[in-house]
Amino acid sequence: METLLKISGVDKSFPGVKALNNACLSVYAGRVMALMGENGAGKSTLMKVLTGIYSKDAGTIEYLNRSVNFNGPKASQEAGISIIHQELNLVGNLTIAENIFLGREFKTSWGAINWQKMHQEADKLLARLGVTHSSKQLCAELSIGEQQMVEIAKALSFESKVIIMDEPTDALTDTETEALFNVIRELKAENRGIVYISHRLKEIFQICDDVTVLRDGQFIGERVMAEITEDDLIEMMVGRRLDEQYPHLSQEKGECVLDVKHVSGSGIDDVSFKLHAGEIVGVSGLMGAGRTELGKLLYGALPKTAGKVRLKNQEIENRSPQDGLDNGIVYISEDRKGDGLVLGMSVKENMSLTSLDHFSQKGGIRHQAEKMAVDDFILMFNIKTPNRDQQVGLLSGGNQQKVAIARGLMTRPNVLILDEPTRGVDVGAKKEIYQLINEFKKEGLSILMISSDMPEVLGMSDRVLVMREGKISAEFSREEATQEKLLAAAIGK
C-alpha cells in the first residue's frame, strides 16, 4: 500500500492552548481516509499546518517520500495537495468556468483568454460531477449545493494526488451526494488519496476505507473501516461509549400551550395540531415537505393566509418575528450562520440581541445585568469559549448552536421551535444539546423539534408529526413511531 502523505508527531500551540499534541495522519494511494474527531479536536488546525497556513512547532510532514514544509495553500496546491473547504470560496458575479480557472485561465497563442477552451474544460469537469448547468452560468445563480459542486470541480481541475474534503456534503442533496461519491470512487481508481472530514457517520462507513481519530489535538488511532463498528468509532472520538445517544425524559405533559387550527400559507396547507407544556413534538418529513416553513410561519417569519393560532387560550397573530418573540414563540433556524447568528459579533452580543428590552432602563442598557445573564447561560450550557467577548464565528459548530439556543431562551419563551438542532454538530456536542432540551422540557417549556434525522426525532420526541407536501400526513405517539412508519407517511405510502 503506497503512502502518499505521512504526518507524524505534529505539535501546534497558540497562546494558552495546545491545539495539536502528537497529531498523526497517513494518506494512501487509492484509498479514502476519514479524519474524525469532535469539533475542536484539531482536524482543521492539522489541515492548516499541512497546507502552510500555520507553521508547526514539532513533527514531520512527508509527501511523495520527501520531507516538505509548505509556505502557504498555493504552494501545497501546486505540489498536488488540494483542499475543498466547508465554507464556499466563489466569486458570485463570475461564471462557473471563471471561478474554476481563476488565475489559471487558458490563453491563445497571442496571449488572449481562450474562452472556448476554458468553457470546454469546465463543462467536462461539471459533467464528471453530474452537474447539468452550463459553465457560462454565474455562480450567484446557483444553489448552495450546486456552488459546492463547483468548488469540487475547481479542486479536481488541479489533478491533485491528495484531495482533502472538509464536510463536502453539508449542503448537497442526496443526488449530489451520490454524484460526489461516484467521483470519489473514480479518484480512488486513479490511485489518488482522499482525506474525508465529516461528522456524518453513515457517510464515513459508506465511502471511507480507513479512519484516523483525533481527540483534544492528540492522535488516538488509525483503523480500517471494515474492522470497526459505529460504537467503536464514537468511543474513540469522545473517550466513552454513547450507548444512550438520545436521553429521552418521560414525564406527564401539562396544559395545551399552542393550538394550531387549519393553518395555511407559504407552503403550508391546512395544518392542525396541539403542543403541550413539558412536551417535545417532533416534525419529520422529506426535504421540501414544509417543515421549516411551518416553524417560520408560527414564529412570524412567513405570512399566514388562513387558520387560527392560539397561545395559552388566546388567539395570536404573528405578522413578524418580533410579534413571535413578543408572544413568547422562539424559532432557532436550521441555518445558524445565515439566519441565526451574527458571526462577526461576540458571544455576549449574539446572546442578548433579542433580549435587550429585558436589560433596558430609562433608555439605556444595564450592561452589568446583561453580562451576568450571558455568563449564567455560558455556564449552564457549558459553552466552550475563552470569555463572553469572543467572536462567535470562532467557536465550534456545537458551541455556536448552544449560543443560538441560549439567545432564544433568554427571551423567556413559552414555545421553543428548534429547526435541525444538531445539524453540523459532532456526536459529543449532540448529547449535550439533547440534555439541554430535556432540561427545558422538565421546566415546562413546549418544544417543536423539526429534524431530518429520523433517529433523533424518534429518540427525543413524545409525539411525531409527519409532513408531506405542506400537510400533516400522519401523527404517531412515541410508542407507535418507527423509521419505517415515518418514511411511509413521508412518501405517501
UniProtKB/Swiss-Prot annotation:
Its EC number is 7.5.2.7. SMART domains: AAA. It catalyses: D-ribose(out) + ATP + H2O = D-ribose(in) + ADP + phosphate + H(+). Residues 5-241, 252-491 form the ABC transporter domain. ATP binds at G37, E38, N39, G40, A41, G42, K43, S44. It is found in: Cell inner membrane. GO terms for cellular component: plasma membrane. Keywords: ATP-binding, Cell inner membrane, Cell membrane, Membrane, Nucleotide-binding, Repeat, Sugar transport, Translocase, Transport. It holds the Pfam family ABC_tran. It comes from the Bacteria. The complex is composed of an ATP-binding protein (RbsA), two transmembrane proteins (RbsC) and a solute-binding protein (RbsB). Belongs to the ABC transporter superfamily. Ribose importer (TC 3.A.1.2.1) family. Part of the ABC transporter complex RbsABC involved in ribose import. Responsible for energy coupling to the transport system. This is Ribose import ATP-binding protein RbsA.
